[in-house]
């Protein structure tokens, strides 16, 4: 029936497995074990998506307007904003369609709903993969700018950045299409989990390496000017705190989603895992929160971008 197809959450194959879903309620009744399920109101979900949408549209518009921001680093930031924009808009679209179908305001055939769901699935999955890839690309770009400062402009040329961006988008779309087509295979889910862990390790290694170099540089300046050691220690603490926040937000926002995928493979019928599966929308909400935080970390800290954004907003008035 159309409503049955419409009520499936986007990436429904990740939310639960065909064998485990029908028995969740019965298993809980037999054991009497309470199952914690956090309910995310659709209004809150849509509001967070709208905030993310506005933020990332502003980032893309500001970078597109200012030619001084057409550098490899800002190209990666722009693509991160674009992929985050697609993550939030695709989830908003899915939620809006489900609400309209449930309210009877949108009537359509089951085949049309299924095609729409498959399209949104591919869009959501590819945009998530792109977001992870561009977070890694930004880390690589910053690492090159610090450790190869004199050769940075010859290494990170605009042409190479564009080729890397094109490769990321094409690879993400193709891999997400394969993922949706073979989402019932455990190997596909494990590949996604391994990819997330690889991005996490890559970012951690690069940023820790950059922090170590920054601390060495600060220590050298301290010795040169014969200042007290606590100044260097304070810089190290601030850098460590910044690094902890950056990686912590990444892990907290994306980790639960990929933990969910891991549990789908390892324990699809276990009662505890089934309880976790019920909180799938919470994990999507955390990813939406990540798309809200990304512009604050990577884009709005730039004085040039903030100035361009201010000009855009003033011109619009």
Swiss-Prot record:
Where are lipid groups covalently attached, annotated S-palmitoyl cysteine? 315
Q: Which organism is it from?
A: Ateles paniscus (Black spider monkey)
Any one Pfam family here would be: 7tm_1
The coding gene here is MC1R
**What protein name does the entry list?**
Melanocyte-stimulating hormone receptor
Keywords associated with the record: Cell membrane, G-protein coupled receptor, Glycoprotein, Lipoprotein, Membrane, Palmitate, Receptor, Transducer, Transmembrane, Transmembrane helix
**What membrane topology term does the record carry?**
Multi-pass membrane protein
| GO annotation, cellular component aspect | plasma membrane
Keyword Transcription regulation present in the record's keywords: the answer is no
For this chain, one GO molecular function annotation is:
melanocyte-stimulating hormone receptor activity
- UniProt GO BP: adenylate cyclase-activating G protein-coupled receptor signaling pathway
Q: Briefly state the protein's biological role.
A: Receptor for MSH (alpha, beta and gamma) and ACTH. The activity of this receptor is mediated by G proteins which activate adenylate cyclase. Mediates melanogenesis, the production of eumelanin (black/brown) and phaeomelanin (red/yellow), via regulation of cAMP signaling in melanocytes.
Quaternary structure (record): Interacts with MGRN1, but does not undergo MGRN1-mediated ubiquitination; this interaction competes with GNAS-binding and thus inhibits agonist-induced cAMP production. Interacts with OPN3; the interaction results in a decrease in MC1R-mediated cAMP signaling and ultimately a decrease in melanin production in melanocytes.
């Amino acid at each position: 029936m159309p409503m049955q197809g419409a009520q499936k959450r986007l990436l429904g194959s990740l939310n639960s497995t065909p064998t485990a879903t029908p028995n969740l309620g019965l298993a809980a009744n037999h054991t009497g074990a309470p199952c914690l399920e956090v309910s995310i109101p659709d209004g809150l979900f849509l509001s967070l998506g709208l905030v993310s949408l506005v933020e990332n549209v502003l980032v893309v518009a500001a970078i597109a307007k200012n030619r001084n921001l057409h550098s490899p680093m800002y190209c990666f930031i722009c693509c991160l904003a674009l992929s985050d924009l697609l993550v939030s808009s695709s989830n908003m679209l899915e939620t809006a369609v489900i609400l309209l179908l449930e309210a009877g305001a949108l009537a359509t055939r089951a085949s049309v709903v299924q095609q729409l769901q498959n399209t949104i699935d591919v869009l959501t999955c590819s945009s998530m993969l792109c977001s992870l890839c561009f977070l890694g690309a930004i880390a690589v770009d910053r690492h090159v700018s610090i450790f190869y400062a004199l050769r940075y402009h010859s290494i990170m040329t605009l042409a190479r950045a564009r080729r890397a961006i094109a490769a990321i988008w094409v690879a993400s779309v193709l891999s997400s299409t394969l993922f949706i087509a073979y989402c019932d295979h455990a190997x596909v889910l494990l590949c996604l989990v391994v990819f997330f862990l690889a991005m996490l390790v890559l970012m951690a290694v690069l940023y820790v390496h950059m922090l170590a170099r920054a601390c060495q540089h600060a220590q050298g300046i301290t010795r040169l000017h014969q200042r007290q050691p606590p100044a260097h220690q304070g810089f190290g603490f601030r850098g460590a705190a910044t690094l902890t926040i950056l990686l912590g937000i990444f892990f907290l926002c994306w980790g639960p989603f990929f933990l969910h995928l891991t549990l789908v493979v390892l324990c699809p019928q276990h009662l505890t895992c089934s309880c976790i599966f019920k909180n799938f929308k919470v994990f999507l909400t955390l990813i939406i929160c990540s798309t809200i935080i990304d512009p604050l970390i990577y884009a709005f800290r730039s004085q040039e971008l903030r100035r361009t954004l201010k000009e855009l907003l003033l011109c619009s008035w």
